[in-house]
Design a protein with these regions (language model features):
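Pyridoxal 5′-phosphate
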Residues: 1-243
Length: 243
């Protein structure tokens, strides 16, 4: 979840779906953090954003089952998607090319390739799976450290979702005595700390928690416990100013 950071049991979700249901998984918060076996999770499609794993922005990746590639039609028909055309009609490409209309984001694709090559260097065996495992282990250290620090502020800060160890390193929170998200965001910006405040494209979930929005702090491979110390020092200072 891009709000709670929790990791869901996709196989369990899949088992509760009707056979004809198209099962699409948004892996933007999971693919950058740990290895996913697309065939194992039983999804029809998996999407993720490349910039969340250190590539450039404006690049999305769509993984489809072969059968779904045959069944689905493209949203946009443009250069590269057409196999043949006449005055009266056209024939689409039969493979994944029918979904790749126009000039692709070449720079973005190259940046993702280099990001993946860098991730390989994180493991002694120089493999992608080993690099992803290194990211996961580092992130779990940050998760434990972050939860421990938030526990000390429980009377002033509310974390959203179940705070379990099975999660990625993003944390959405609200201050119990401050609902002005712009003020919170501006305060952290003044400390050169980047957080996001708002609905995070998940308004129904926020309504479930009876909240108009939350502030979200995220950590990744390039963050350290020293970075987290700076965040919590600033958060504590903000809480003091409210009193």
């Amino acid at each position: 979840s891009n709000v709670t950071g929790n990791i869901y049991d996709l196989k369990k979700i899949k088992s509760r779906l009707r056979k004809e249901t198209f099962f699409l998984v948004d892996g933007s918060q999971s693919v950058p953090n740990f290895s996913i076996d697309f065939q194992d999770i039983g999804a029809d499609a998996l999407v993720f954003t490349a910039h969340k794993m250190m590539a450039q922005t404006w690049l999305w990746v769509l993984v489809l089952k072969n059968q779904r590639i045959k069944e689905l039609s493209p949203l946009i028909v443009w250069g590269g998607t057409i196999k043949d055309a006449t005055i009266s009609g056209f024939d689409l490409q039969k493979n994944n090319q029918k979904f790749e209309a126009g000039t692709p984001n070449i720079i973005g694709a190259v940046s993702l390739l280099h990001a993946l090559e860098f991730i390989k260097t994180l493991s002694p065996e120089q493999t992608l799976s080993g690099g992803m495992q290194a990211i996961w282990q580092h992130e779990q250290e940050l998760v434990r450290y972050t939860l421990k620090n938030f526990e000390q502020l429980w009377n002033a800060v509310q974390l959203i979702g179940s705070q379990t160890a099975r999660r990625v390193a993003l944390f959405s929170f609200v201050l119990r005595d401050e609902q002005n998200f712009n003020r919170i965001w501006e305060f952290f910006a003044e400390q050169n700390i980047c957080i996001r405040c708002g609905g995070h494209c998940a308004y129904p979930l926020h309504k479930h928690y009876h909240l108009g929005g939350t502030c979200r702090m995220s950590a990744y491979l390039y963050n350290t416990t020293e970075d987290l110390d700076r965040f919590f020092t600033s958060l504590s200072e903000l809480i003091k100013r409210q009193r």
